[in-house]
Structures are given as structure tokens and as C-alpha cells.
């Protein structure tokens, strides 16, 4: 059976399909719907404070008794100067003026927020914790393992996969360059991140690690799931496929933009957050490209552009908001998450029967 392997056994799920923990875009309904359909729903905790994460976990548990996970951002060493912030504020001033916004006061709470997330995951006995942007400390990994939390790391290269296994991860997401949203890279210099496609990355990682590999990047339906399994993956992680679901927290602006875009419309940019991410191209990305080398690292840039993105979204201006999307938008639907899951499973079974 295609759906019975080490990963499904480890995560206590029926199907090896993981809904990506997209920060700012998941809802309890989305997470629970995927879990209730036999996959692993994942809370995107990246931007949550402690109380928000606790409430989200409690709400998910009201909707499902099945396994689910929480995705967290691993803090990274920030590299920026005061002149970078001053220059960026000057470059962003025309956008703020047009939207009647004041210059924000930047507050960096990334390290403390991460520690609180880990404490909450342990306190609430969350079954699975997924990491992006790096590998946590040995101490944190030990604490989570002692609490029987299954750990999933993210790798965009073979070297990152090896580092994840060595650190004690139970499984690894092999994130191909087709994936929407932030790149999970952490070993390469910030402007030279690996851009290896899913079909190349997955088998190369499978061949050098002994733990389950989860394919991610451009996978939208049953065909992508089966292709990943043939490459050696024991599961898939899907983001954009669930982002356009009516159960996600995506705005209608973003949902419509993805549904109406094509495979050539996305670009890699750090304009919005300070970390390279794939999204639909727009005016802000193009105008900020001239400053690409001077953009402050995440979370500084993310803080500096936050009010602009929120104000633009409120007035329906898609030229000034981030529209994260993978490279397979033509395959996106607005179905409820449980319908997306059943369609994927039915398509896989039909293909298997035909073959």
C-alpha cells in the first residue's frame, strides 16, 4: 500500500500527506480538516505569541482527536546595520506616505518567541514539531524528545539534510525550489541559497539519510504525491494546494491572485521579509529589486514592511502585498481541505489501479 510506511506509523496518520505550517495562513479548521481526513494538519506558529499559540492548539483539539503538528521558525543570526534600516525607511517612505502610515518602531523578539513556542508545544503535548530556517539547539531537541514530540526538519540541500539527521530529527522535509513562501535554507550564505528542484533534491537526499524524507515544492495533487514516492520520499508536504482552500486564512485577494496566475508568474525575493521567498511578482518586488543587496535580514525587513502590507491588503492593493505561491498555481483549487484531501487520495488510487 502506498500509504503505509515509516512516516505514517511515526506520525500516527493514515496518509503520508502533510499540510505545510504556513505562518499567518493556517486556521484551526484547516489543520483539523486535514488531520480528520487522514493527513497531518500543521499550525503555522511563526508569527504567534504564546497565548495565540495556546488558543490555536486548544481550538484544533476541539475539532479533531487526530495527530497534528506545529511549525516554528528557528531564530537565525541577524546581520544588519543602523544605516541599512535608515536607508530602507527612506526607500519605504513613499509607500507609507501614500497609505498614511508612520515609520514603525522595530521590535526584535524572535529568540524569546521561539523559546515560548517550544515551551508551549511541550506543555500542550503537541505530537509533532516542524522546524524551518535551521536546526534548534541540542538542549531544545533533547527537551522535545523527552516529551515524546516527533521532530521534522527542513532541508534545501543534501548537506542540510545530513545536518538535520545528525542533530536528531525524526524526518526531513526536502524543500525543492518550486516551493512557495520562504526558503528553509540555513547553511549557505543568505544571497546564495540552494535552488535545487524537488525532482532532483529528493532522491539525492533519500540516498544519504536513513530517516524518512518528505518531498515539498510544486506538489499539488495525487500525481505529485505518487511521483515523490517513486523518487524515494515517504511523504509529501503541500502548502499552496491548501493555501487557496476556503478553509485557510488567505485573503480573497491572495486566493484570487494564485488561482488566476500561471507557472511563470512567481519570483524569488527578499523584499517583504528579509528572507528569500517565492511569490507572485508585483510592483513592490520589482521596485525593491534595485535595493536587493541592502535589504536588512529577517525579521527587521519583515517589521519595516508589515504596516505597508496590512494597509495595502485592507484596500485591496495586490501590488504592495506578499503573495506567496509555489510554481504550480494552475493546479490550485478553492475546495474545502477535506475535499482536496479526498481528491488527492482518489486520484492516487485511480492511478494505482490503472497501472
Curated annotation (Swiss-Prot):
Top-tier EC class: oxidoreductase
Molecular function, one GO term: nitronate monooxygenase activity
Domain of life of the native organism: Bacteria
Cofactor note (record): Binds 1 FMN per subunit.
Residues spanning the signal sequence: none
Database matches in Pfam families: NMO
Catalytic activity of the protein: 3 propionate 3-nitronate + 3 O2 + H2O = 3 3-oxopropanoate + 2 nitrate + nitrite + H2O2 + 3 H(+)
Cofactor(s) this protein requires: FMN
InterPro entries linked: Aldolase_TIM (IPR013785), NMO (IPR004136)
One of the protein's GO biological processes: response to toxic substance
Keyword Repeat: no
Residues involved in FMN binding: 71, 175, 180, 218, 237-240
Enzyme Commission number(s) of this protein: 1.13.12.-
Keywords: Detoxification, Flavoprotein, FMN, Monooxygenase, Nucleotide-binding, Oxidoreductase
Similarity annotation: Belongs to the nitronate monooxygenase family. NMO class I subfamily.
Something else known: P3N is a potent irreversible inhibitor of the key enzyme succinate dehydrogenase in the Krebs cycle and electron transport chain. P3N has been shown to be a toxic metabolite to bacteria, plants, fungi, mammals or any organism that uses succinate dehydrogenase.
Biological role: Nitronate monooxygenase that uses molecular oxygen to catalyze the oxidative denitrification of alkyl nitronates. Acts on propionate 3-nitronate (P3N), the presumed physiological substrate. Probably functions in the detoxification of P3N, a metabolic poison produced by plants and fungi as a defense mechanism.
Protein name: Probable nitronate monooxygenase
Organism of provenance: Staphylococcus aureus (strain NCTC 8325 / PS 47)
Phylogenetic classification of the source organism: Bacteria, Bacillati, Bacillota, Bacilli, Bacillales
Amino acid at each position: 500500500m502506498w500509504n503505509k510506511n515509516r512516516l505514517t506509523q511515526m506520525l500516527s496518520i493514515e496518509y503520508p500527506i502533510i499540510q505545510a505550517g504556513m505562518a499567518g495562513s493556517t486556521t484551526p479548521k484547516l489543520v483539523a480538516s486535514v488531520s480528520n481526513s487522514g493527513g497531518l494538519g500543521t499550525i503555522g506558529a511563526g508569527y504567534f505569541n504564546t497565548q495565540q499559540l495556546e488558543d490555536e492548539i486548544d481550538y484544533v483539539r476541539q475539532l479533531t482527536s487526530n495527530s497534528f503538528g506545529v511549525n516554528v521558525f528557528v531564530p537565525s543570526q541577524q546581520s544588519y546595520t543602523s544605516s541599512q534600516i535608515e536607508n530602507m525607511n527612506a526607500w519605504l517612505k513613499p509607500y507609507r506616505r501614500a497609505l498614511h502610515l508612520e515609520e514603525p518602531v522595530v521590535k526584535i523578539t524572535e529568540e524569546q518567541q521561539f523559546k515560548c513556542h517550544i515551551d508551549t508545544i511541550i506543555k500542550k503535548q503537541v505530537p509533532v514539531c516542524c522546524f524551518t530556517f535551521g536546526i534548534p539547539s541540542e538542549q531544545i531537541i533533547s527537551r522535545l524528545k523527552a516529551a515524546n514530540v516527533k521532530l521534522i526538519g527542513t532541508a534545501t540541500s543534501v548537506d542540510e539534510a545530513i545536518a538535520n539527521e545528525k542533530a536528531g530529527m525524526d524526518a526531513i522535509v526536502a524543500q525543492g525550489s518550486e516551493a512557495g513562501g520562504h526558503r528553509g535554507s540555513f547553511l549557505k550564505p543568505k544571497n546564495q541559497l540552494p535552488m535545487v528542484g524537488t525532482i532532483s533534491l529528493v532522491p539525492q537526499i533519500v540516498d544519504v539519510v536513513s530517516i524518512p524524507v518528505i518531498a515539498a515544492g510544486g506538489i499539488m495533487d495525487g500525481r505529485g504525491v505518487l511521483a515523490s514516492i517513486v523518487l524515494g520520499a515517504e511523504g509529501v508536504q503541500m502548502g499552496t494546494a491548501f493555501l487557496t482552500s476556503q478553509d485557510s486564512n488567505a485573503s480573497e485577494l491572495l486566493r484570487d491572485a494564485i488561482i488566476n496566475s500561471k507557472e511563470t508568474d512567481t519570483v524569488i525575493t527578499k523584499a517583504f521579509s528579509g528572507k528569500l521567498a517565492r511569490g507572485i511578482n508585483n510592483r513592490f518586488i520589482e521596485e525593491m529589486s534595485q535595493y536587493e543587496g541592502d535589504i536588512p535580514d529577517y525579521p527587521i525587513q519583515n517589521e519595516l514592511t508589515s504596516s505597508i502590507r496590512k494597509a495595502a491588503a485592507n484596500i485591496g492593493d495586490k501590488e504592495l502585498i506578499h503573495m506567496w505561491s509555489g510554481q504550480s498555481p494552475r493546479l490550485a483549487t478553492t475546495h474545502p481541505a477535506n475535499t482536496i484531501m479526498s481528491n488527492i487520495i482518489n486520484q492516487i488510487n485511480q492511478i494505482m489501479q490503472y497501472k
